[in-house]
């Protein structure tokens, strides 16, 4: 049998020691950690950002050079001579105006850009001015505008120039008689036997009774087309003298002149007319 004292010692060794775990269960922040939290406050972070922004602004900021009147005159005179000076010319000019050669080079770059802008604006202004000059002005329409319509010529008068471009002088001979573009010297003038009525731009012929004159003369032949008044676009038309009124009435239904020559054969004379 075992001793009860041994059993008590075994049970005491098996039971865990909770005092060793008490230090892990209780959490207390250390002084160093609390100081780190205090350093990372929002106010300090914003101030650090402002400092960084100031440093960046100083890096991006360029030093602008102020030129005196003497320096500007010397630079402009050199620019008038050449827009692209070489290194030796820039160094000589920089020593003259007491500026670094880099500043002189930058000034020439800016001056060339300004010159190109001015040249482009001048070209655009000239183009607009030329367009205004070439465009027609419509002011005369407003000045000459009237409420009353223009007066039309009467129907019984004929304008000086017809629609086909032939003037009144074309239908007149040297004696002032109206003909149809060819001489009637050997056949007689139709103005003696006919009556021409002008309505607008169309001619109508009203033949009178010319039985006696037509019987005395034979049927005329077509005249030669060598007359300067006859053109290939307006073929001649020679009206034959028609003694009967029936033919003349039928002839009056068509406007004159015809686009092609029309020939009418005279009617056969009866024995009663021949005996007369």
UniProtKB/Swiss-Prot annotation:
Gene Ontology cellular-component annotations: nucleus
Residue stretches of biased makeup (Basic and acidic residues): 209-219
Residues of the DNA-binding region: 60-119
GO MF: DNA-binding transcription factor activity; DNA-binding transcription factor activity, RNA polymerase II-specific; RNA polymerase II transcription regulatory region sequence-specific DNA binding
Composition bias type Polar residues, residue spans: 220-229
Start and end residues of each stretch annotated as Disordered: 28-62, 209-230
Biological process terms in GO annotation: neuron differentiation; pattern specification process; positive regulation of transcription by RNA polymerase II; regulation of transcription by RNA polymerase II
InterPro entries attached to this UniProt entry: HD (IPR001356), Homeobox_CS (IPR017970), Homeodomain-like_sf (IPR009057), RAX/RAX2 (IPR043562)
Location within or outside the cell: Nucleus
Keywords: Developmental protein, DNA-binding, Homeobox, Nucleus
Pfam family, one: Homeodomain
Annotated Low complexity bias: 28-46
Function according to Swiss-Prot or TrEMBL: Required for cell specification of the RIA interneurons.
UniProt name for this protein: Homeobox protein ceh-8
Name of encoding gene: ceh-8
